[in-house]
Structure formats: structure tokens, C-alpha cells
């Protein structure tokens, strides 16, 4: 039996956002394994973690200290320890090339949109990802598109795997999930979108498409979740008053409320120009909700055959209307819903090191 140390020190970064959510779901699902012991480092070393939090210590420093401590301890004790780093960083060490490690690379947004990152941050990411490429760690990419982006800039990893993000969409999710049709609930027919402050999320494009769909009678409202109330108000200020009243900013909502909003929506909409995975779209798809998506590689990879791809602002609305009507009738299942089930994702992570151990045991 191996011990998996999950470096949840990412929680020290208060702006981790979606990456933190993914890490928490992955940790919960891996803990259900009966074959291996899985422990978060914040629980293995609660006093050290709490001291680091109070002192504002960088997670990179804490990861480096704890990783090297456990490397030395494992050498003396003979314990098989596997370290899992959920967000790109492999600690500095003089002890080998991280063959005992798994590191997750989510996306290369800083390469696609360098203007959003300082020069120091870009250099840091270049250095960290270059080290991951040269390491003996299992490097996990959250989509094939993300891996291809990585390999355009860095060397091909010695041990690379594509494992989709775990999608926890609550009880009753998956094939055949019973959802409202979005055709006339008490809250009206609404699109649902998650607001994000980065311009590449193309929120202006969402507003423009909603305006056209509303005028054609396809939907009544646009519901927006997340922060950014002031930004949303500024963006809709130029709309006609009647249309402006149809944009409903719901703010930060509970997990249960978010899933309820997904289930009642006429469609989920995301027109971003770059994604590494798009967890919100995957959550909606797992619940059987129609998707209106920008036509980018990762959306094609994940949602081809399920979602409707919006090629540009002048899109013909007739095919879109037919898609929504057909989806309401057929209620198709998303092809990757099982691949993204938390238990299936956890199994894939365990398989990475189990396969290496089996191969090593078979060698003479």
C-alpha cells in the first residue's frame, strides 16, 4: 500500500479559484480508495500549515520544505510515498527527478494572453513548466488541447497523461438525468453564464448573442453567477432599458443553488476565446443542459456531438434554435460524463503509479 501526500497548500493562495475547486474534488474522491492511503499535507502537518498561513508563507516554500522532508523520511523508513501537486509546481530538490511525484498542468493561459501576467510571473511559469517537462514525474494535463499547447512551448514530457477534471454535479447527474426543459419555468427561459473578469472570457459576446436570442423569442433572461456586479452593470448600461432588465446578476450562490440554476436553464453559454478545460460547461453537460460554446479546440475535444458551437457574432440563429429544440426532445447524454466522474478520475490518478510499480516488479 502506498501513501499519497496531496499538497493542498494551494489553499494558501486565496485567488486560486477553479483550480482549488478541482483539487478539493480530486482529494475527496481519492480518499475513498481502499487500496491506498491518501492524506492532505495540511492534515499531516496541521501546525506547520497553520503557521505558514498566519505568516503568509508562499506555498512554493512550504511545498519544498515538506517534500524534501518526506523524501528523506521515506528513504530511512522504506515507506512508499507518492506526492501529488495539483497545480504545476514541482518543489526544488537534490534528491532525484521527482519520479515519486504527480503534477497537474491545467493550461497555458499566460502564453495565449501574456498581457494579463507580469514579466516576473511569465518567467517563473516558464521555469516551472520547463522543469516539469524535464522531470521524471507523471505530468497530468486536463485535456489533450492543454497538452498540445504545452508541447508547442516545452519538451515532450517523459511521462505524460491526459486526465479530465473531476466533475461533481451532485446526486442524479449523468445519463438520463431528469432536468427541466427550460421552456417555461416560473423563472422564465434563461441562459446561464458564469461571469469572469478576464477579457478573453468574452462576456461582451455573451451579451450580444443573448440580445439577438431574446429578440427572436428564444429566451427571456440571461442569468449570471459569480462576482463582478459592478462590471456587469457597466457592460449592460448601453442596452435598452427593457433588455437591461432581463439580465439578472445572481452573485455568488451556494453549490446547491448553482446546480438548481443549471438544471432549470434553457442553455449554458460560454464564448471564451481560451480554455484549458471549462469546468462550468462540463458541470452543465453532466446535468444534461444544452451548451452554447465558442468554437475553440478544447470545446471541440470535450463537447463535440453534444454542444452547439458559435462561430462568430453574425451566427445564423435558425440552426441554434433547432439545436435547442432537438436537445429538449432527445435529452442526449454527454459522452464524457463517465470519464469526468470523480471516482473514475481518482482511479486514473492511482493507475499512474500502480502501472509503474507493476512494470518495475516485472523487470529482471
Where in this protein do the model-derived segments appear?
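Carbohydrate transferase catalytic cores enriched for Leloir-type hexosyltransferases
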Residues: 1-364
